[in-house]
Swiss-Prot record:
Its main location: plastid. It comes from Cuscuta europaea (European dodder). The lineage of its organism: Eukaryota, Viridiplantae, Streptophyta, Embryophyta, Tracheophyta. The gene is psbF. It is found in: Plastid membrane. GO terms for molecular function: electron transfer activity; heme binding; iron ion binding. This b-type cytochrome is tightly associated with the reaction center of photosystem II (PSII). PSII is a light-driven water:plastoquinone oxidoreductase that uses light energy to abstract electrons from H(2)O, generating O(2) and a proton gradient subsequently used for ATP formation. It consists of a core antenna complex that captures photons, and an electron transfer chain that converts photonic excitation into a charge separation. InterPro entries: PSII_cyt_b559_bsu (IPR006241), PSII_cyt_b559_CS (IPR006216), PSII_cyt_b559_N (IPR013081). Keywords: Electron transport, Heme, Iron, Membrane, Metal-binding, Photosynthesis, Photosystem II, Plastid, Transmembrane, Transmembrane helix, Transport. With its partner (PsbE) binds heme. PSII binds additional chlorophylls, carotenoids and specific lipids. This is Cytochrome b559 subunit beta. Heterodimer of an alpha subunit and a beta subunit. PSII is composed of 1 copy each of membrane proteins PsbA, PsbB, PsbC, PsbD, PsbE, PsbF, PsbH, PsbI, PsbJ, PsbK, PsbL, PsbM, PsbT, PsbX, PsbY, PsbZ, Psb30/Ycf12, at least 3 peripheral proteins of the oxygen-evolving complex and a large number of cofactors. It forms dimeric complexes. NCBIfam families: cyt_b559_beta. Its cofactor is heme b. It comes from the Eukaryota.
């Protein structure tokens, strides 16, 4: 199958998306938590 060809590209894309999404979610979560604690 063509899984061997698309697998590396999908893996790199998956790592890039999660590499950017995880810090973004953590950043937004920390900001919302700070504002919630201040109130």
């Amino acid at each position: 199958m063509t899984m061997d060809r698309t697998s590396p590209i999908f893996t790199v894309r998956w790592l890039a998306v999660h590499g950017l999404a995880v810090p973004t979610v953590f950043f937004l979560g920390s900001i919302s938590a700070m504002q919630f604690i201040q109130r």
